[in-house]
Amino acid sequence: MKFVDEASILVVAGDGGNGCVSFRREKYIPKGGPDGGDGGDGGDVWLEADENLNTLIDYRFEKSFRAERGQNGASRDCTGKRGKDVTIKVPVGTRVIDQGTGETMGDMTKHGQRLMVAKGGWHGLGNTRFKSSVNRTPRQKTMGTPGDKRDLMLELMLLADVGMLGMPNAGKSTFIRAVSAAKPKVADYPFTTLVPSLGVVRMDNEKSFVVADIPGLIEGAAEGAGLGIRFLKHLERCRVLLHLIDIDPIDGSDPVENARIIIGELEKYSQDLAAKPRWLVFNKIDLLDQAEAEEKAKAIAQALGWEDKYYMISAASQTGVKDLCWDVMTFIIENPIVQADEAKQPEKVEFMWDDYHRQQLAEVEDEAEDDWDDDWDEDDEEGVEFIYKR
């Protein structure tokens, strides 16, 4: 299945049903009073995270989602039926952005998590709501309010513990094939990997972590060269980055300059991502003698000003891979995700009609006090009054 990590959709919540103006009419009850019911609320639009999905490709074809309108109120104090909600399932790791305001509405980080993205319109009020001691035959009603309408951008960001960085042909896909059951394509030409892939590294029956492989970066990626840096967003939630360096590039390029290019593109994309823990991993040491590989790795680390520990591996022969994985596992255990590091959810997403009824009824009470001397009768020729008609 094609990997799609961005999609734009339109969500429209249902309008609220209108209130009803009606008076009770039964045998022997000539003046039964008002009995107009309220309308029904409009349906909401929800997003729900589903761990069984891994792409947004469905929303490249189906782009519009509309909830049901609430039914109008009826006589005999019958309330209109509420509109049906619409639930849109998205992969875990999806970020939701309102394109109209640029607001991040939320991050779908857990299976089953639900997020309301469009709130249905409030129901209109029937004339029963407006009866009082001075207004016994109210002809007022209110109309249902329109539902929210939003253009949303869905961005899928893979959830992984470890992310891999490197130039094309640095051996990232070979590494993920060696440590997990993932089988990304491997070949001797650049940009073999065109889309991100995930692999689960199982150290034993109880310990495991997830590693993400993204397409390689080249100089100018921030300006769109190669595959650009659009896939770097998949590393934003990783706890540690493995920077793979081809210790003996087949094209004769300088490993030091290659490493600096990756660091530079990382900083151009995001300072937060550049500040994440990053480990230096020299790959393809099987192409050199051990002494020569050690000498070259030391020289590269010194040229980069690297003072921390670095690793020497061969993903193809799996030399040094197990020790690296155990160190990664230990780091993950010692640095669990804390609440402050998780994506911050907005405290409250503002919708159009959150305070509509409270404000509306307050206005009606004020009007009733002003009109205490009105003496309406059900036979009056006055028309129905609409409160806050839009």
From Swiss-Prot:
Compartments where found: Cytoplasm
GO molecular function, one term: GTPase activity
Annotated segments matching region Disordered: 127-147
EC number, as in UniProt: 3.6.5.-
GO biological-process terms attached to the record: ribosome biogenesis
Binding site for Mg(2+): S173, T193
InterPro entries: G_OBG, GTP-bd, GTP-bd_Obg/CgtA, GTP1-OBG_CS, GTP1_OBG_dom, GTP1_OBG_dom_sf, OBG_GTPase, P-loop_NTPase
Protein's name according to its UniProt entry: GTPase Obg
Source organism of the structure: Citrobacter koseri (strain ATCC BAA-895 / CDC 4225-83 / SGSC4696)
Biological classification of the source: Bacteria, Pseudomonadati, Pseudomonadota, Gammaproteobacteria, Enterobacterales
Gene label: obg
